[in-house]
């Protein structure tokens, strides 16, 4: 007669290490300590006394600026006023830590510029598997697998003027990461009679940047901008 034996092994600790009465007492004690901690926070005002972190000689008792001190915490966000989406910033890359740094930098920049923002939202991660031959001759039958993971995150800006959004995006583009791809979508809101305002415009004033240019390409661009077909599609 064949007998099969089964053996099991688990590294999980015991669920109940305390008796029921000891567990109830522990929960009550934790509730009392939490209430005491909340009362102490509401009554006692904590003193702001940051440390001086610098290798140079500084003025005595000179504190660190508050915006530098806030780098240790999550980015602050302003509340929405109307909830109108004005811009969407999508970032993607292969290193998730860099995406978090870029997202927090954009959130901190928007906070100091007065732009209400959404939290940093994670989008669907893209995973791809590539299979190629190892070499075209002797090892042509040998295959190699390459696994690529692309992370994506998104930020949404609300209730801000177009000029502020352009300034915010230009500052982010100026300090961008080389291994992170940025994609911004800007939304603009116009009145209901916007098409009538466009029809009422008879002439479009070109910028002065095209004046006095001898470049034939620039002259051709100026000619196309003045053409009737361009104004018709505009």
Swiss-Prot record:
Superkingdom, taxonomy of origin: Eukaryota
Cell location: Mitochondrion
Keyword Nuclease: no
InterPro entries found in the cross-reference section: Ribosomal_uS10, Ribosomal_uS10_dom, Ribosomal_uS10_dom_sf
One GO CC term on file: mitochondrial small ribosomal subunit
Name of one Pfam family that matches: Ribosomal_S10
UniProt keyword terms in alphabetical order: Mitochondrion, Ribonucleoprotein, Ribosomal protein, Transit peptide
Chief place of localization: mitochondrion
FT transit peptide: 1-23
Protein's job: Component of the mitochondrial ribosome (mitoribosome), a dedicated translation machinery responsible for the synthesis of mitochondrial genome-encoded proteins, including at least some of the essential transmembrane subunits of the mitochondrial respiratory chain. The mitoribosomes are attached to the mitochondrial inner membrane and translation products are cotranslationally integrated into the membrane.
Family as reported in the entry's similarity comment: Belongs to the universal ribosomal protein uS10 family.
Subunit structure: Component of the mitochondrial small ribosomal subunit (mt-SSU).
Name of the protein: Small ribosomal subunit protein uS10m
